[in-house]
Amino acid sequence: MIHEVSKTLCAQLIDQLYPDYLLDRDGVQLCIPRHEHQDVQIGIYLYDISEYSITAQRYASVDGDSRVFPPKLMELSYLIYVNEDARFGGYNKEQEEILYEEMIQIFHDLSVLQVKNCQLPLQFVNMELDSKIHIWESLHQPLQPALYLRVAPVEIASMKNEKVNIVRHVDVKTKSKHKGGV
């Protein structure tokens, strides 16, 4: 499901930005921000996967003759950046700002990501500058403008299920130990 979410983000940008802002449909890709990705115009990087902790704890349920365990709810955090090193038409600062504005409009208008049969809330992350610097430093890159998005809750299905024996009928026989009287 995680890869499906990432591919859907990528497809949304391609559908909205090509051909007006992208040279070709391969201009948006899932990749880490690095100088060697010169064919990428816009990069989408999943930088964090964490537990979605806002919901109440869910327990296994019985479905027929098996116990089904609940999915794990996760939060996916993305960094979306305009590649300053893009080959064949790298962006000047003005073009870069226009592209960021277009992407902000796309994600603001979208607000919910349709992935398979799920509607997943999509929101911008208001991140402190120190946190942004930390992310970029961990990638060995200087800080640059980027959009930070969160998709949550994303259900990751449990592979665990157990066979249960369900008691459907009980025969109860009792014998009285008292003889006579009360």
Language-model-detected regions and their locations in the chain:
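Short intrinsically disordered coil segments
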Residues: 59-64, 94-95, 161-173
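Short, cationic low-complexity segments
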Residues: 67-71, 105, 165-182
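Short, charged, low-complexity patches
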Residues: 2, 6, 71, 92-100
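Small/polar-rich, solvent-exposed N-terminal microdomains that initiate assembly or binding
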Residues: 1-60
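A short, solvent-exposed, low-complexity linear motif enriched for acidic/polar residues
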Residues: 8, 12, 16, 152-154, ...
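Oligomerization/assembly interface segments of phage tail-like spikes and tubes
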Residues: 70-85, 101, 143-153
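Acidic-leaning, charged glycine-interspersed low-complexity segments
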Residues: 98, 104-156
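"Short basic amphipathic alpha-helical interaction patches in structured regions
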Residues: 58-63, 90-101, 118-119
